From Swiss-Prot:
Start and end residues of each ABC transporter domain: 12-250
EC numbers, comma separated: 7.6.2.11
Stated role: Part of the ABC transporter complex PotABCD involved in spermidine/putrescine import. Responsible for energy coupling to the transport system.
Protein name: Spermidine/putrescine import ATP-binding protein PotA
Record note on quaternary structure: The complex is composed of two ATP-binding proteins (PotA), two transmembrane proteins (PotB and PotC) and a solute-binding protein (PotD).
Species the sequence originates in: Pseudomonas fluorescens (strain ATCC BAA-477 / NRRL B-23932 / Pf-5)
Annotated gene: potA
Gene3D superfamilies referenced in this protein's UniProt entry, alphabetically: 2.40.50.100, P-loop containing nucleotide triphosphate hydrolases
Catalysed reactions, as listed in the record: ATP + H2O + polyamine-[polyamine-binding protein]Side 1 = ADP + phosphate + polyamineSide 2 + [polyamine-binding protein]Side 1
InterPro entries per the UniProt record, alphabetical: AAA+_ATPase (IPR003593), ABC_SmlMolc_Importer (IPR050093), ABC_transporter-like_ATP-bd (IPR003439), ABC_transporter-like_CS (IPR017871), Mo/tungstate-bd_C_term_dom (IPR008995), P-loop_NTPase (IPR027417), PotA-like (IPR005893), Transp-assoc_OB_typ2 (IPR013611)
Length: 372
């Protein structure tokens, strides 16, 4: 692939973008030299806690804010200094901002009727596009209704359809599901992903909800304190976190302090805080004698009735019933406490009682070796 073709397959490229409010030398820094590539037709998520800079970055792509330094490329063209109306992007906000005095069809038509000179559509073209968008979000029979006659999920669909109607090259979504209840939010995730696949438009989605990010995304960028911590596919982010922040922010995990005792053929062996041998894990960067932290997801640990056949001896300290799962708190001989999650299946996972002794097994390759 030549350089020109590679550039053309990128929808958005963020190059050394920095955002400082107030004095550029002493003001608060919202973004610190961000570099990101977002591919054409990709569902890309900016994920992080409140204040991490994800919404600021989205607003700069939209043109609502401008970077202190750096470039924002849209299909290879720098748009960092352009106002919003000169950017072929649209935004769906957390609050849908539908016009209450207009019908749904009129809401969708409004943006099409307000196009700049040279891009004006005929009445027939606008009506056809409105019908297409209502069909896309399965709201054709509600065309004559007004927003206050809709549920929250229906309003969200119309806001999405209105943003897609002008054929944007990139659609920006700023936590659009956060106002919905859990069941509706889960249903809308499936619809969002299906609509993105059907339209082929690049979606850039902002959320603090890890489950949303893992469910929807082709790739995720995890942000913290104005910096990108890791970019990757959902399974990479979850199973191979680059640092302690990513491991802790995405899902649940156990952190185990350990020392590298042996490295051989791409595997590393470890000893725990009290010197107990811990299972080997794939690792090519650790060195013998190095202090590291192992991150192990609760579902990658398994309990058995005794500590035979390589299992570590442990004690059941607590049991929490979660419906589909059982969550155990266990302690090792040195006092290290770990969380173990097993399916709620009496046939395959006999329930262990609090206070009893048990054996703890690590899945091979289950631990991420964190060097920070």
């Amino acid at each position: 692939m030549n350089a020109l073709h590679a550039l053309q397959t990128l929808a958005v490229s963020i190059r050394s973008v920095r955002k400082v409010y107030g004095d550029p030398h002493s003001g608060p820094v919202a973004l610190k030299n961000i570099d990101l590539d977002i591919r054409d037709n990709e569902f890309f998520t900016l994920l992080g806690p409140s204040g991490c800079g994800k919404t600021t970055l989205l607003r700069m792509i939209a043109g609502f804010e401008f970077p202190t330094q750096g470039e924002i490329l849209l299909y290879g063209e720098n748009i960092a200094d352009r106002p919003p109306f000169e950017r072929p992007v649209n935004t769906v906000f957390q609050h849908y901002a539908l016009f209450p005095h207009m019908t749904l069809a009129e809401n969708l038509a409004f943006g099409l009727e307000s196009r700049p000179m040279g891009q004006v559509l005929s009445k027939a073209q606008i009506d056809e596009r409105v019908r297409e968008m209502l069909a896309l979000v399965q709201m054709e029979r509600f065309a004559a209704r007004k927003p206050n006659q809709l549920s929250g999920g229906q309003q969200q669909r119309i806001a999405l359809a209105r943003a897609l109607a002008p054929h944007p090259k990139v659609l920006l979504l700023d936590e659009p599901l956060s106002a919905l209840d859990l069941k509706l939010r889960q249903a809308m995730r499936e619809e969002l992903k299906a609509i993105q696949a059907k339209t082929g438009i690049t979606f850039i989605f902002v959320t603090h909800d890890q489950e949303e990010a893992l469910t929807l995304s082709d790739r995720i960028a995890v942000l913290s304190e104005g910096e990108v911590q890791q970019v990757g596919r959902p399974e990479e982010i979850y199973e191979q976190p680059r640092n302690r922040f990513v491991a802790d922010f995405i899902g649940e995990t156990n952190f185990i302090p350990a020392m590298v005792s042996r490295v051989e053929a791409g595997l590393a062996w470890f000893s725990g805080p009290a010197g107990q041998a811990l299972p080997a894990q794939p690792c090519t960067t650790a060195k013998v004698g190095q202090q590291v932290t192992l991150s192990v997801r609760p579902e990658r640990l398994h309990l058995r009735g005794d500590a035979s056949q390589g299992a570590l001896a442990c004690r059941i300290e607590a049991l929490i019933y979660l419906g589909t799962d059982l969550q155990y708190q266990v302690s090792l001989g040195d006092g290290t406490r770990l969380t173990v999650r097993t399916p709620n299946s009496l046939e395959h996972h006999p329930r262990l009682s609090v206070g009893s002794s048990a054996g703890l097994l690590f899945e091979r390759g289950s631990a991420s070796v964190l060097l920070d």
